[in-house]
Amino acid sequence: MKQLQLYGWLIWMLAGANALAAPGVDSARLAVLENSLDQYVQDGRLAGGVLYVSRHGETVLHKAFGWQDRERSIPMNTRSLHRIASQTKAFTSVAIMLLQERGALLISDPLSKYFPEWGDVKVAVADSDADLGYRLEVATRPITIRDLLTHSAGINYGRGVAQAAWQEADIFGWYFAGDQESMRDKVRRMATLPQAAHPGREFVYGYNTDILGALVEHLSGQTLGAFLRQQLFAPLRMRDTYFFVPPEQQARLSTVYAMTKDGLQRQPTADIATANPGNFYFGQGHYLQGQIGGPRSYSGGAGAVSTAADYARFLEMLRRGGELDGVRILGRKTVELMTANHLSRDIAYSRPGSGFGLGFNVLLDVGQAGQLADQARVSFNGDLVMSLTRYTTESTYISTTALGDQYTFTVVQDISGVVSVK
């Protein structure tokens, strides 16, 4: 199976439990890693986290370090819940492929078949002579479901030359759980706004997977959360994965910190919100504070909360070709399709040695990518850095994430460099 990588974040880096002996795993390197991560916490480079390392489906290391809530002196533990942001996209992409396997859709279908509002897409093209700084062009072809899965639909996160139009429509940022509006209604309104590029011409990271989540709801007649619970989370025994954390579990939700020039800062804060009006990554108050409940607007691109152990089960299912513990979620050929590169040579992709599958970044050339493993990816989304490294040949993977900047990037590099097979 080709290597897959997931965009997104989730503060999983190493936290409080067991390093287990496993053939082909260098325990001395794991010890170095544990000491390094403890030092990162002491130095104020990380507040805390959880690292889960698995090989051949067996847990090699599952340990917590640092703080779940530094100011309240609550230590991180392996059962801490983490906001996984864009790693939610992998769940939603799998849901779409489940629906294709069941005949509910084809990924070649135009989006307008299900949401007619997307039949008249306009694209904003920079034009200094235009009053708004851009002109509108009719999209050269319809957006397909495949375009959404590969982020080649031309839909971004409401930024660029038409950013003011998106802000005026109150569609901005990457998390909508606090909204009274359903995602299906929001997706219909998105169709009326200027898009960032013509379909099939560019890789544009954006609301694509949120739209796919709304499509899952439209076709299944369920909320995205209910569909994923029934079809994915429950069968895989992912008991600690939610869109809306039950009140009795909210004490397990880890605090989010941002790396600033003054060090780690608890999020959100009034000064950051004031100093960065309309900032894309800050001001996500409901998400960052964990005030999760009430409205039921399910963000298929960034809305889930999970644990390292739960997400490891999801990854293991994919590594095994769609099956885990005798439960088949996807067909083997479907997983192969998802992890193949679907970007044509005409679509520029800024990550050397990589392509993009149906929901995942795919490593194509280890040399060009310059990674130590069969696959590894560190992706930056402003202040969010996430690395998912999978040693496919050796069936080993680690998942790490942090809220930070280039300084934090060195931490995940260190992890990728130390955890490797003999």
PLM ranges: what are they?
Residues 1-8:
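Bacterial N-terminal signal peptides that target proteins for export
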Residues 16-17:
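N-terminal signal peptide c-region/cleavage motif recognized by signal peptidases
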Residues 23-84, 104-106, 120-127:
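Short, conserved catalytic-motif segment at the N-terminal edge
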Residues 31, 37-38, 57, 81-111, ...:
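Active-site SXXK
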Residues 41-45, 74, 379-381, 388-391:
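Short loop/turn motifs at secondary-structure junctions and domain boundaries
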Residues 47-49, 60, 82, 376, ...:
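Short loop/turn microsegments at loop-to-beta-strand junctions
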Residues 116-374:
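Short, surface-exposed loop or secondary-structure junction motifs
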Residues 381-422:
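Structured C-terminal helix/loop/strand segments within mature extracytoplasmic catalytic/sensor domains
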